Amino acid sequence: MMKLKSNQTRTYDGDGYKKRAACLCFRSESEEEVLLVSSSRHPDRWIVPGGGMEPEEEPSVAAVREVCEEAGVKGTLGRLVGIFENQERKHRTYVYVLIVTEVLEDWEDSVNIGRKREWFKIEDAIKVLQCHKPVQASYFETLRQGYPANNGTPVVPTTYSSSVSGIR
């Protein structure tokens, strides 16, 4: 299923969830520092770069495209961390590891909407994400648990109380 919204086509899976893809962009293979970007809706908040998949687009291709647009980085795509559900917002996001090999000086979202990017130590990234993006904070817990990147990757359902979900 597809829906048009302004300049983009949104794709949905059979359950009506928006299909999304994102990357945990690490500075090196040691995976000690991760790149977060400022939210387009709340520029004072940090988020994991990612977004909606285009029609017929593979999740891995969408993830690489989204991080280039939102964070201005390119790199080596690694393992699939997992597929995460945000039941409150009806999103299903494929999350990958990306080892950054190139940092662009100017990129699409920096030019168009003034988006910023910043490197965070993992613990600090979890802290800044927990209050307003708890599903994104859970990406790191799943990464630590080391689920294999294969067809058996579990869908990780996440639900949070309405008091938390009202904070975007």
Swiss-Prot record:
Mg(2+) 1 binds at residues 50, 70. The active site is at residue 69. Keywords: Acetylation, Cytoplasm, Hydrolase, Magnesium, Metal-binding, Nucleus. Mg(2+) 2 binds at residue 66. Mg(2+) 3 binds at residue 66. GO terms for cellular component: cytoplasm; cytosol; glutamatergic synapse; nucleus; synapse. PROSITE patterns: NUDIX, NUDIX_BOX. Its cofactor is Mg(2+); Mn(2+); Zn(2+). One of its GO terms (biological process) is RNA decapping. Present in heart, lung, liver and spleen (at protein level). Widely expressed. It is an enzyme of class 3 (hydrolase). Pfam families: NUDIX. Binds 3 Mg(2+) ions per subunit. A motif (Nudix box) lies at residues 51-72. It is found in: Cytoplasm; Nucleus. GO terms for molecular function: 5'-(N(7)-methyl 5'-triphosphoguanosine)-[mRNA] diphosphatase activity; 5'-(N(7)-methylguanosine 5'-triphospho)-[mRNA] hydrolase activity; diphosphoinositol-polyphosphate diphosphatase activity; endopolyphosphatase activity; inositol diphosphate tetrakisphosphate diphosphatase activity; inositol-3,5-bisdiphosphate-2,3,4,6-tetrakisphosphate 5-diphosphatase activity; inositol-5-diphosphate-1,2,3,4,6-pentakisphosphate diphosphatase activity; magnesium ion binding. Residues 17-144 form the Nudix hydrolase domain. The keyword Metal-binding applies. Its EC number is 3.6.1.52, 3.6.1.61, 3.6.1.10, 3.6.1.62. The modification N-acetylmethionine is found at residue 1. It catalyses: diphospho-myo-inositol polyphosphate + H2O = myo-inositol polyphosphate + phosphate; 5-diphospho-1D-myo-inositol 1,2,3,4,6-pentakisphosphate + H2O = 1D-myo-inositol hexakisphosphate + phosphate + H(+); 3,5-bis(diphospho)-1D-myo-inositol 1,2,4,6-tetrakisphosphate + H2O = 3-diphospho-1D-myo-inositol 1,2,4,5,6-pentakisphosphate + phosphate + 2 H(+); [phosphate](n+1) + n H2O = (n+1) phosphate + n H(+). Cleaves a beta-phosphate from the diphosphate groups in PP-InsP5 (diphosphoinositol pentakisphosphate) and [PP]2-InsP4 (bisdiphosphoinositol tetrakisphosphate), suggesting that it may play a role in signal transduction. InsP6 (inositol hexakisphosphate) is not a substrate. Also able to catalyze the hydrolysis of dinucleoside oligophosphates, with diadenosine 5',5'''-P1,P6-hexaphosphate (Ap6A) and diadenosine 5',5'''- P1,P5-pentaphosphate (Ap5A) being the preferred substrates. The major reaction products are ADP and p4a from Ap6A and ADP and ATP from Ap5A. Belongs to the Nudix hydrolase family. DIPP subfamily. Monomer. This is Diphosphoinositol polyphosphate phosphohydrolase 1.
